[in-house]
């Protein structure tokens, strides 16, 4: 066992040769490297698979022996300071390593087909492999300096992948937004690291925790300064894990390729913030104020992310806000001190969310045959619907991921989310009410995404549903706005007018007109990007199922979604593998070793949580299930529903909720108005002050010197009369001064 731990340092470096060799090959032998691009993809998967096997071996040994291993190399600079580098293998490291490698392998296999049409295929795999290396280095770090180095590398890789299609202005802006937002958190993280080094004199986790606990117990530190340093450390996690108020970069990050969205949301960048807080829990646990602050930020993010997901038309952005809300649950659990449930939910959510993102990528991939390589169209749920007939495997996998995230047993997220919800009652009834109500919101918006995507009819064609009359009652979204229209002399079809807008621009359920799309209109829909040699060979008016290379990872993730939750079933300690796995960490956090519960208590809590989820699903089905397609005469329904005061009031509430959700809670607008515009005005004022004041003073002195010199030069023109005039003038002035001084 000791020998296995000694070679654990190789874990972060195994995937590293792939990006290095790809870069070297593209520099020296570009043609040969591009012709062998599938070989590089295979090597990426192979090396990451070796890391996964290594991580599994370490995890099995830790489950059996509950051991922690650390090895460091000391770089002595002088007698007062030493910088150490090494690696730490503990339950948290092994959990994160398995999570990164398993999800990473699935994403790499999936990407081979998904990115096959793209000229940046090799660049994508180089970034992905380096991303895995950076994240593995982060989770195996033994001190705060290494954490910060790999933290920045993880951020760099995410920026490169978010802006992968950098020729698209939207993707470039999304990359810049992610960079600037994370700069705020990373600067706070750096200040926090330096602050705790100033307090304890060490970067190593073990020494840091031990020294700090001794200082706290002896009351030898300033509590205000310690809390400030802890908040600065936590600021890094807020930005990385998209917690309020530094969450604004996450939905825009969907401009990157879908596979990287799956990796970022499941096992890498957003998980890094949760990992950092979990790693520093022994530090935070002795600072009560910071624990309360962590839980407060978590509960705000839980509710905020869920409400912002209600009105999204983009399938990936809806899933992004879902990730934000679920990360809030994890942060809430960590703030409550529920270490086990937070990591449990991190595991279950990772596989469920990876399944959902890869499923959405399969949907987008199939929609591109109809609307082309245009994210605004291929990711728009308003144009989808009825896909269950065309992509049945993707539909079933997406449904399983949806039900898991909704908290339906026995799927993975049910077990972990239920633990967090139950623990919230013990911590704060107010937090518990918000957390439980948000569980209903989660079920609602996830079911909404599923229904808009797979149920009903294929709305990109938008034919009448009954076959006899145009039926405008089946309107896609209570929350959706009218999109852009296609204008053409021969095209009398509005591509996304699925909700008829009234005079004030609000969505209306009842309209008098429905526009149909003829064959000429369908033929006009072409890809906005035509890539030679990589164009789709299949052309169809309907979507089709993805290739086996994309379906295989989805099927594997289905197995994880079905069975990974059983790792932490709390009925019996003998089968509770997760508790055995986390035994050292649980003891460190002063948690009880008895994690088993009785059947009655579990069933009582489970029935309540499942009932809330079912209520959210029911509301979603009531609003979005295409039950109206069977009605042939809509005048009957229009005559029943009348515009009364109650209807007007309910419409105002719906519109207010829609505006809040669709406009991202106005946080982006607030930042744009006060921060972005404020910084620009400050820059303009600084520019004015620099040019007119700072530069104006020396320029003015120079100008005055030039003017005086010109005057003196004109005086010394060589005329004797001028010299005599100035001579007598100066003598007269001096005599007058002398006279007045002697009065």
From Swiss-Prot:
Its main location: plastid. It is found in: Plastid, Chloroplast thylakoid membrane. It catalyses: a plastoquinone + NADH + (n+1) H(+)(in) = a plastoquinol + NAD(+) + n H(+)(out); a plastoquinone + NADPH + (n+1) H(+)(in) = a plastoquinol + NADP(+) + n H(+)(out). It is an enzyme of class 7 (translocase). One of its GO terms (molecular function) is NADH dehydrogenase (ubiquinone) activity. The chain crosses the membrane at residues 9-29, 40-60, 89-109, 125-145, 147-167, 185-205, 224-244, 258-278, 284-304, 327-347, 354-374, 396-416, 425-445, 551-571, 607-627, 723-743. The keyword Cell inner membrane does not apply. It holds the Pfam family Proton_antipo_N. Its EC number is 7.1.1.-. Keywords: Chloroplast, Membrane, NAD, NADP, Plastid, Plastoquinone, Quinone, Thylakoid, Translocase, Transmembrane, Transmembrane helix, Transport. GO terms for cellular component: chloroplast thylakoid membrane. GO terms for biological process: ATP synthesis coupled electron transport. It is a multi-pass membrane protein. PANTHER family: NADH-UBIQUINONE OXIDOREDUCTASE CHAIN 5 (PTHR42829:SF2). Belongs to the complex I subunit 5 family. NDH shuttles electrons from NAD(P)H:plastoquinone, via FMN and iron-sulfur (Fe-S) centers, to quinones in the photosynthetic chain and possibly in a chloroplast respiratory chain. The immediate electron acceptor for the enzyme in this species is believed to be plastoquinone. Couples the redox reaction to proton translocation, and thus conserves the redox energy in a proton gradient. NDH is composed of at least 16 different subunits, 5 of which are encoded in the nucleus. This is NAD(P)H-quinone oxidoreductase subunit 5, chloroplastic. It comes from Helianthus annuus. The gene is ndhF.
